[in-house]
């Protein structure tokens, strides 16, 4: 089912009795033909139930299955079960044209409203130690021991597959702090490393960085540490002397995340 919006077209496709695919294509955009690395099974076209009452459009595979209820004015979607109970409700969606190097690209964001008692699992294999990732910021990159899978499962009985091959931020940060490097050459260690070139001995250097962050109100905050390189050897982040992130091994991804409680006011950050 295609639904015309003010700046694009929304496609809602029942893939099975309990699965619905949603696509949005802005006007004037030609999408390249890319190999589908996630949805690889050939699927026959199937009939679906379509009903419109005023600005409300309901799409489902059949009357007793999962249904998507679309607000035809705003394009926002609410997913309901066969009994009409809300499973998931869309909050904000954004599609903006941009550049990736010399190529035209789209920057897409999608958010949903979740319950305070909900647990979310998924996004792949990470070293941050979190099983419930509700509210946790993660950058989904493939690097050595980190395996990113753009899918989450809820304890409420649903799942979301983000079928997008671009760099993805889960619960993206809305505030960035650039830290200043400390004086001195830093410490170094020599390690044995195994890679595609075989076993080698490497000398690795560590530097210290510091800065401050201003918190407007007390609460739990998600912190993402980005070392600015393709890989890292150490993740150490303290706030006001308290350790928030601490990982040290031969192969670390460039980012790591944690949720911590911060009181209102200024806090000192130290990273090594």
What do these predicted regions represent?
Residues 265-267:
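Exposed beta-strand face motif in extracellular beta-rich ectodomains
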Residues 1-189, 195-225, 230-262, 271-272:
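N-terminal accessory segment at the very beginning of proteins
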């Amino acid at each position: 089912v295609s639904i015309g919006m003010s700046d694009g077209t929304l496609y809602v496709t029942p893939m099975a009795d309990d699965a619905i695919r949603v696509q949005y294509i802005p006007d004037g955009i030609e999408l390249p033909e890319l190999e589908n690395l996630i949805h690889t099974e050939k699927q026959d076209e199937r009939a679906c139930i379509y009903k419109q009452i005023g600005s409300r459009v309901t799409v489902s595979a059949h009357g007793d299955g999962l249904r998507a209820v679309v607000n035809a004015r705003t394009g926002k979607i609410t997913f309901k079960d066969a009994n009409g109970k809300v499973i998931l409700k869309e909050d904000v969606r954004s599609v903006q044209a941009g550049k990736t190097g010399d190529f035209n690209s789209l920057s897409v964001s999608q958010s949903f409203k979740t319950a305070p008692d909900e647990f979310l699992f998924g996004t792949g294999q990470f070293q941050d130690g979190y099983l419930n990732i509700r509210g946790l910021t993660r950058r989904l990159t493939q690097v050595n021991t980190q395996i990113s899978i753009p899918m989450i499962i809820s304890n409420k009985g649903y799942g979301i597959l983000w079928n997008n091959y671009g760099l993805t931020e889960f619960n993206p940060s809305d505030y960035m702090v650039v830290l200043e490097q400390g004086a001195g050459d830093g410490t170094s260690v020599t390690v044995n490393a195994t890679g595609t070139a075989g076993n080698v001995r490497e000398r690795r250097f560590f530097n210290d960085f510091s800065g401050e962050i201003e918190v407007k109100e007390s609460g739990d905050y998600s912190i993402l540490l980005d070392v600015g390189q393709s890989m890292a050897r150490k993740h150490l982040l303290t706030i006001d002397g308290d350790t928030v992130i601490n990982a040290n091994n031969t192969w670390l991804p460039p980012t790591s995340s944690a949720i911590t409680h911060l009181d209102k006011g200024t806090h000192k950050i130290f990273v090594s």
